[in-house]
Amino acid sequence: MKMAGWKKKLCPGHHLWALGCYMLLAVVSLRLSLRFKCDVDSLDLESRDFQSQHCRDMLYNSLKLPAKRSINCSGITRGDQEAVVQALLDNLEVKKKRPPLTDTYYLNITRDCERFKAQRKFIQFPLSKEELDFPIAYSMVVHEKIENFERLLRAVYAPQNIYCVHVDVKSPETFKEAVKAIISCFPNVFMASKLVPVVYASWSRVQADLNCMEDLLQSSVSWKYLLNTCGTDFPIKTNAEMVLALKMLKGKNSMESEVPSESKKNRWKYRYEVTDTLYPTSKIKDPPPDNLPMFTGNAYFVASRAFVQHVLDNPKSQILVEWVKDTYSPDEHLWATLQRAPWMPGSVPSHPKYHISDMTAIARLVKWQYHEGDVSMGAPYAPCSGIHRRAICIYGAGDLYWILQNHHLLANKFDPRVDDNVLQCLEEYLRHKAIYGTEL
């Protein structure tokens, strides 16, 4: 009776008016129905509702990561110079810079995990069946800057993936506790079972990844590939794009592997020892085991599960692992050499035709200061728009268009204290592309 009375009030007893009112009621009912069907907390991947534009819009609005400043991220990602200059000028204004989130902030907000994940806008369900069926493993080695770690985790997070986090034993206790608090909110993120003190350019950097490899192989997740990261990395592809790129490898690995220069050969000519730092001795090392040809690359790799298994279990691999332990920066020649070893799954021959530069491999995009220059004159890339640290570009907003033109899965280095605009725009770009499948 109440419903009938409500209809009479809304729709007076005129036939034409009544027809219009019933049409209005139908539209309202449809919109309410769509709203209920688009419950973003319980979307079914196979449902038509999930694929509808209306639901995508609702989902994006609940998860979008817009830049917090008045910068034109769409223009920056497209290389619009006016937008880039505005962002670079904006970054110079100290008063506009937000202080980084602290260990204490994360210790407090993670007391309520659901609030933390909602407020920090983590994607908590697979965005496609293809992604669900192709889980990726991550080895994440960190030692400082808790907000950097949390934003990196958020950017690469998907509930079907598996994440091992190694924290440097030397890190402050509050940092370690904040990392533990964050990962306690996710069933598929865990701390490495064995932690080591990481010394720059020493074996410990490799050991951190090996510890995560062991743990990841013991997990119940049937991951296909392993990616390793550090705290200054950030993805430049969505999880869906990564899955597609990894499938195209067809079991092969992707990492830099080139012939070493004479200066780099000195890295394994003498033995190195570790105290608080790494220092050379006068002790000459024996040649590589079985006169294996040595190659150089970097610390980062895209490795198949079978490759990882052989790193840990194959006797020939273990002999090489032992041999490189007292060399300088072994992470930059161990993986590169194993990638050319004939017994390793997914490797490539040692013949020069198979040399792989960092620009050819998909593991990591880096701008080296000594390679920057005029592209029209043959330089591989333009000068860094941020600053340099250890001859590596800390990206600025002017680098983002170039970054997004490359095929790599991740890029290095980012630091929000140097330029947060480039990171915010990259976050906005990736989140938009993850939900809509299109660029900003």
Curated annotation (Swiss-Prot):
Chain ranges passing through the membrane: 10-30
Subcellular location: Host Golgi apparatus membrane
GO cellular component: host cell Golgi membrane; membrane
Lumenal side: 31-440
The protein's name: Beta-1,3-galactosyl-O-glycosyl-glycoprotein beta-1,6-N-acetylglucosaminyltransferase
Disulfide bonds: 73-230, 164-384, 185-212, 393-425
Protein family membership: Belongs to the glycosyltransferase 14 family.
Gene Ontology molecular function: any one: acetylgalactosaminyl-O-glycosyl-glycoprotein beta-1,6-N-acetylglucosaminyltransferase activity
Organism: Bovine herpesvirus 4 (strain V. test) (BoHV-4)
Chain positions carrying an annotated carbohydrate: 72, 108
Catalysed reaction equations from the record: a 3-O-[beta-D-galactosyl-(1->3)-N-acetyl-alpha-D-galactosaminyl]-L-seryl-[protein] + UDP-N-acetyl-alpha-D-glucosamine = 3-O-{beta-D-galactosyl-(1->3)-[N-acetyl-beta-D-glucosaminyl-(1->6)]-N-acetyl-alpha-D-galactosaminyl}-L-seryl-[protein] + UDP + H(+); a 3-O-[beta-D-galactosyl-(1->3)-N-acetyl-alpha-D-galactosaminyl]-L-threonyl-[protein] + UDP-N-acetyl-alpha-D-glucosamine = a 3-O-{beta-D-galactosyl-(1->3)-[N-acetyl-beta-D-glucosaminyl-(1->6)]-N-acetyl-alpha-D-galactosaminyl}-L-threonyl-[protein] + UDP + H(+); a beta-D-Gal-(1->4)-beta-D-GlcNAc-(1->3)-beta-D-Gal-(1->4)-beta-D-GlcNAc derivative + UDP-N-acetyl-alpha-D-glucosamine = a beta-D-Gal-(1->4)-beta-D-GlcNAc-(1->3)-[beta-D-GlcNAc-(1->6)]-beta-D-Gal-(1->4)-N-acetyl-beta-D-glucosaminyl derivative + UDP + H(+); 3-O-[N-acetyl-beta-D-glucosaminyl-(1->3)-N-acetyl-alpha-D-galactosaminyl]-L-seryl-[protein] + UDP-N-acetyl-alpha-D-glucosamine = 3-O-[N-acetyl-beta-D-glucosaminyl-(1->3)-[N-acetyl-beta-D-glucosaminyl-(1->6)]-N-acetyl-alpha-D-galactosaminyl]-L-seryl-[protein] + UDP + H(+)
Domain of life: Viruses
Membrane topology value: Single-pass type II membrane protein
Gene: Bo17
GO biological process: protein glycosylation
The EC number(s) this enzyme carries: 2.4.1.102, 2.4.1.148, 2.4.1.150
Stretches assigned to the Cytoplasmic side: 1-9
